[in-house]
Amino acid sequence: MITDLILHNHPRMKTITLNDNHIAHLNAKNTTKLEYLNLSNNNLLPTNDIDQLISSKHLWHVLVNGINNDPLAQMQYWTAVRNIIDDTNEVTIDLSGLNLTTQPPGLQNFTSINLDNNQFTHFDATNYDRLVKLSLNSNALESINFPQGRNVSITHISMNNNALRNIDIDRLSSVTYFSAAHNQLEFVQLESCEWLQYLNLSHNQLTDIVAGNKNELLLLDLSHNKLTSLHNDLFPNLNTLLINNNLLSEIKIFYSNFCNVQTLNAANNQLKYINLDFLTYLPSIKSLRLDNNKITHIDTNNTSDIGTLFPIIKQSKT
């Protein structure tokens, strides 16, 4: 059982994991080469000991969640931990599962922040210019302000399982990964997010989405919403399109705008008529689901090699 810890300098020591102990005192004044430090689930109290870590200019990843199992102590301890940051470092902080309701100070100094499984109802990241990755899954979020300005560098946002009705990421042109599944979103606009590669908005209340042309998008998940139609946007590199469990009545809009799609799931919609000629515009298609629709007629007049499509067709109600 470790209760007191003195970290002496070692020329090759870069990673230390000390999670799940009973450490109450830390002396780390000589850890000048340390890059990764895990202190999760210990009994550390908010003292000045942690300030000694500022001498480690290489430190980039600190885990301190579960400190002392006391929200107030965690907040105070966090105030000390934030002094570790050096402006040139890329630093990750994990504060998940602490039942926090108020934003800790100093978060704007970090490049990667994990705040999953807390109790935030609002989060303000307006001045988080250094932020690259933000995870706020399983909170109680009703609103959020994203970073603003010319130097915004955020690429990864995950906000699944919250209570969001509206979000505005249209000015976050740097985002490549955005996931806000299991919220209450009714409308999303992200025309300016030109570098998006992964977009998951499933399990919301979406009736419309304005995405614009997305040359980099690889996966688009709009399943389990209330969409009746989709805009005729261009997704030339899209690999996976999930639009199942909506209210779509037609599928004609896909055609050449989805020429590289390999997986298309349009099950559980309101489709009544299918012209399989649209498959000629999807030369890469490998998986097509049209089951549980209201299809009464399938037009195969202009579709070659219909035999290869039979396993796909018979999944639907004909």
Swiss-Prot record:
Mapped LRR repeat ranges: 109-129, 130-151, 153-173, 174-194, 195-216, 217-237, 238-258, 260-280, 284-305
Keyword Repeat: yes
PROSITE patterns, A to Z: LRR
Gene3D superfamilies per UniProt: Ribonuclease Inhibitor (3.80.10.10)
UniProt keywords, alphabetically: Leucine-rich repeat, Repeat
Keyword Repeat: yes
Coiled-coil blocks: none
Pfam family, one: LRR_1
Note: Missing about 125 C-terminal residues compared to orthologs.
Name of the protein described by the UniProt record: Leucine-rich repeat domain-containing protein YddK
Organism: Escherichia coli (strain K12)
Originating gene: yddK
